[in-house]
Amino acid sequence: MSKKKFIVPALLAGSAAVAAYMFAKNNDTGEEVPDDCYVFDNGKHCAVYRERGPVNVTMIGGRHTGKTDLVCDNILSANKSCVVFDKNGEKYRNLKETLKNSGFAVGRINLMKEHASVYNPMSFLEDDMDVITFVRYLMDIQLDGETDFLRKAEEMFLSACVHYLMQYKEDADIHMLYDMIPAVENEGDYLVDDDALTKTTQLFSVLDETSSAKRYYKAFLQAAGLMINETLVKCKERLNMLLPLDGDYEDESGIVDLRDKKEAIFVTFPADEYYTPAHEFYVKSFMTHLFKTLTNVNAEKLQDSDPVCIFVDDYEYVKNTDMFVGTASILRKYRVSLFATLSNVLLNDADDVISLLSCSNACVYLGGCRDSYAEHFLAKYFDTDCLIDAIKIKYVD
């Protein structure tokens, strides 16, 4: 195999602290470890090449294989802004004070129902394209591949609602998208007559003809034709999806520009059965805002700056929010480094895993996956020349 540089699971180049920790804990060879190296369980150490730019790493292993510890070690050794997807808020509670003492501004986008500081994606919509993107995310999450012949009409109505919020929320008791539900329902539980249509018409009829909300509402009427009520029923279902995240929706994210200062943003969300489509919707909205923020940075500043790091522990909980792991080109464009861990590699998740691995400079398998398919899948995906004892690394030119 030709000589190639390779990347190891250390997104944050220059973190001698993690190297020393891993060396003291796991290395029995007695070798001297260079400052820019990281040591793993078998005593092997690999160089980190600082000039390579963003580093995207995937770590795969079962329970109790040390994935979370490695994530936390890398977060604490950060020397640049980072975003941490934080299941149940554990990392926020454990790391926030240490990060503050290290000079970070620590923020939190909290999607946990029992807390109040919930992220409001409406705060960052600025133009028609933002609105359309926002609405399509909301619809796609619920469609789950099914064909919806009312899709165009739904898209126009939901866009009208969003534009209404953007333009008139200062003068109304409407701050979040689901606050529009009263505009599409009557006194009963379901839309069974024209009362709701009358109420909706009253809401938009008083608006100026030049307003975007009025323009999209007219487009909705044209697209829906004789199926206006049926369209409103579907729209109400989509708005109802957001109800589980009830709370105080004052924007407390504190995000201005992750490249202007060292900032650590924790996106906390519930795991297991408490993780709903609404959480996915808010996470996708946040990632849209994050990438838009990075896009707005001028090219010269973007080139000279360190990449923002994204940490995702237990990727399977956020795998459907794959807009930030879809292709390596997206990550390179925005100079975003990704550190993800995955606890299970299952047959029915193969496409999701390949999507994640395809944008990774390196993958490390820590063992411990109970499903025998995991071993077969990894052995088939990685070149056998990339095997270093129990650790499989994907090399890149």
Where are the regions a protein language model picked out?
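Short, polar loop/linker segments at the starts of domains and inter-domain junctions
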Residues: A47-V48
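Conserved P-loop NTPase catalytic core
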Residues: D352-C386
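P-loop NTPase motor domains
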Residues: L11-Y21, N26, F40, K44, ...
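Short, solvent-exposed coil/turn elements at secondary-structure transition points
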Residues: M112-E114, N344, C369
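Membrane-penetrating hydrophobic segments
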Residues: M1-L12
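Conserved H-loop
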Residues: A340-L347
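Ser/Thr/Pro/Gly-rich low-complexity linker/stalk segments immediately outside membranes or between
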Residues: N27-E32
